[in-house]
Amino acid sequence: MKNILIIGATGQIGSELTMNLRSIYGNDHVVAGYIKGAEPKGELLESGPSEICDITNAQNIADVVNKYNIDTIYNLAALLSVVAEGKPLLAWHIGIGGLWNVLEVAREHGCAVFTPSSIGSFGPGTPAYKTPQDTIQRPKTIYGISKVTGELLSDYYYNKYGVDTRSVRFPGLISNVTPPGGGTTDYAVDIYYSAVRGEKFICPIAQGTYMDMMYMPDALNACVQLMEADPARLVHRNSFNIASMSFEPNQIYETIREELPGFQMEYQVDPLKQSIASSWPDCLDDMCARKEWDWKPQFDLHSMTLDMLEKLSARLKA
């Protein structure tokens, strides 16, 4: 039975991944790591163990690993893309300094490590359509630079020390549970909230700007599936392209209007978000993930929209 530590367990991905992993491996086998000021609440707190686990403090991480006999670490501590641009030193301190701490603890204690990368690891020189698994990256944001560095550092620890590091490059993630928190792709979450509330949506991303997106249930499955994959099949480790759907703002708007014909949207482009979005690929080629660990998403734009509207409507009425 795995003993898992999730660092950043109260964040956008971590809060849902923690509950998902507890449903698979048992509540007592998944520790929710958090920092002061971001304590777990409700079911996340009550369903299993939680510990302060500051990624910038290697001894703190080691203490939690020892206490719970941890063998697998999901490292989800990071600043989101737009937030990171306003706090570049902090973004690097958490994203790279913190990752180094995690990898050192993993090396000393024999832990496997999952540290997600992102479509933000690519830059304007990257082939935009069907972005290959192995290609030029050269991102222009501190978020992307830290993601590329994290990929390389994780591979270094695997090649030099044998640490079982694995990773995926997440597209923009869309959740019906966790509210948006400052990412470039978060417009694709905000738009559903506006639709369910009967409000006009003000879109910060220009029409025609395609980005890869993924529904959170598929993202959670990818995390688990990759960490359970046979290591003998893995040619790539850090980090796999994974894809589900690619769309631009008007497409998601029209898909919502099929269910809510009165929904309205107008564009007020945010220059910072747009500059970041324009530097990212339109869609990724994920054939390596499909070949090496049988990756296959379950949701497309239409099925995600139906589920988002249903789940958000029920939640906002409760």
Q: At which residue positions do the language-model features occur?
A:
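N-terminal Rossmann NAD(P)H-binding glycine-rich loop of SDR-like oxidoreductase domains
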Residues: 4-24
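NAD(P)-dependent short-chain dehydrogenase/reductase
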Residues: 155-210, 216-220
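Short alpha-helix in the Rossmann-fold core of NAD(P)-dependent oxidoreductases
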Residues: 92-99, 146-147
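Conserved Rossmann-fold NAD(P)-dependent oxidoreductase catalytic core, especially the SDR/UDP-sugar
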Residues: 75, 100-142
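NAD(P)H-binding glycine-rich loop region in Rossmannoid oxidoreductase-like domains
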Residues: 55-94
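C-terminal substrate-binding subdomain of Rossmann-fold SDR/epimerase-dehydratase oxidoreductases
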Residues: 204-206, 212-318
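Rossmann-fold cofactor-recognition segment
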Residues: 45-57
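Conserved glycine-rich Rossmann-like NAD(P)H-binding loop of the short-chain dehydrogenase/reductase
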Residues: 25-39
